[in-house]
Amino acid sequence: MALFTPPSEDKDGRDRSGGGDKASGVVRTPFHLRPSLGLALWGPLVPASDNRAGLWTLVGLQTLMGAFFVSRFRALRPKLLKRDIADFPSLNRFSKTSGDMHVGPVHVFADFGGTHSFHRRAGESPGFFQSRRFVSLKRALYLSTGVVLLVQSALESARLTLLVYDPWEEQARGVRDKQFYNDVVRYYHEGVDPARFIVKDPASGNTLPVNVPEVKQGVALARAHTNARNIITRWLGPLDCKPLSSSEFLDKLEHYLDTCDFIQDMNNKRLFGNPAEVKARQKALDALIQANKENRRRIRHILDITPPRGLPLSPKAVDQGLRSIILDPDHESTEDLDLHELWSIYNPWVDLALDTSLSIKFLPTVRTPEELLGDSEDTAVEQKNPPVQIKRERG
C-alpha cells in the first residue's frame, strides 16, 4: 500500500515553502552593480571596469549633461538691457545729448508712470512659477546638478588616466578571461548536438562526425567566442561577477603603491648605498674627469708645438715580427711603392715554406699475444708496411 502526500500549497496553488525556483531547477544569477568613482548616476548601465570605450562614453555623456545644466543656469540669470537715453523723452526732452543706459529686466521707472504700467492693477502679483523666488530655485538646482555631474566626470577621468594600477580593471579582465576558459571547457564536455550543429570540411565540403575531439574543440571555441562577443557580455562582463568593494579597492591600491615604493627604495640603496660612500665615489669620479681633461689639454698642446714626425714611434710599433713589412716613412702614397721589389722581398709562399715543416710517418700496429690468440684462425694477418717518412724540405 502506497502513501501519497500532497505538496504544501494553498488554495491559490502557490508553494508555501518558498522553494519554487529550486524545485523547478531555475538558478537565478545575482547581478551586482559595476564599480566606478563618478558614474553612480547610471546605475546598472555602468560598464565593466575593463571596458574603456564604454566608460569613456558614459563620461562624455555625463560631461555634456553637466555642461547643459550649467548653461541653463547662465541662461536664467538677469539680463541687462542696453538703452539709449534718447529713447526716453521724459529724461531727454530738452536735450540733444545721447548715451547708453543699462537697465535690468524689471522696469525701474514704473514709479514715475508711463504707458507700460497702464495694464497693471493694484495688488496684482505674478504667479509662483514666474516669481523671482522660483527662478532663483531653478538656477540653484541647475548649478548644483551641473557642478556635481562635472565633478564626478572629472573623478572618473582621473581614475582612467592617472591610475597606473586599477584593481577593478584587473579583476574584471581576470574574470572575463576565466569565464571564456570555463565556457570552452563546459561546451567541450557538453559535446555537439547533431540536431543543432552541422560540421563540414572547408576543403572538401563533406559533413564530418561531431564526436571527433577536434570538432568538439572547434565548436566549443566558436560558442565561447560567440558568448564573449555578446553585447551584454562585452558591456557588463560576466553577470555573476561580484566586484571589489571600495575598501578592498583602496587596500589593493595602497598595497601596490607601497610595493612600488619599497622596490624603488631597494633599487636606490643598491645603486647608491651609503651617502658617505656615494659622496666619496662622486668626488673620485670628478677628480678622474678633471685629470682626463688636463691630460687631453697637455697632449693637444704637445702635438701643436711638435713638428711632423718629430715624436718617437710607439713601443708597440717597434716590436714587430721578424718578417714584417717595413715601408719607407717617406712614402706618402701607394704609387711610391715598387710592387715587384716588395713581392720579391716579402714573398708569402716563401714565408709559408719556411714556417712549414711537414712529416708523415706510417707506424706498424703492435698487437699482444692475447689478442692474436683471441682472433679466429682463418683471419688473415695483414703484412705491415715499413715506416715511410715524407719530409718537405725548405726551399
UniProtKB/Swiss-Prot annotation:
This protein's UniProt keywords: Membrane, Mitochondrion, Mitochondrion inner membrane, Transmembrane, Transmembrane helix
Disordered: region residues: 1-27, 372-395
Stretches in topological domain Mitochondrial matrix: 71-139
GO CC annotation: i-AAA complex
Listed GO MF terms: misfolded protein binding
Membrane-topology descriptor: Multi-pass membrane protein
Localization, UniProt: Mitochondrion inner membrane
Pfam families, alphabetized: Mgr1
One example of a Gene Ontology biological process annotation: protein quality control for misfolded or incompletely synthesized proteins
InterPro entries: i-AAA_Mgr1
Residue spans, topological domain Mitochondrial intermembrane: 1-52, 157-395
Described purpose of this protein according to its UniProt entry: Component of the mitochondrial inner membrane i-AAA protease complex required for mitochondrial inner membrane protein turnover.
Family indicated by similarity: Belongs to the MGR1 family.
Quaternary structure (record): Component of the mitochondrial inner membrane i-AAA protease complex.
Protein name: Mitochondrial inner membrane i-AAA protease complex subunit MGR1
Protein encoded by which gene: MGR1
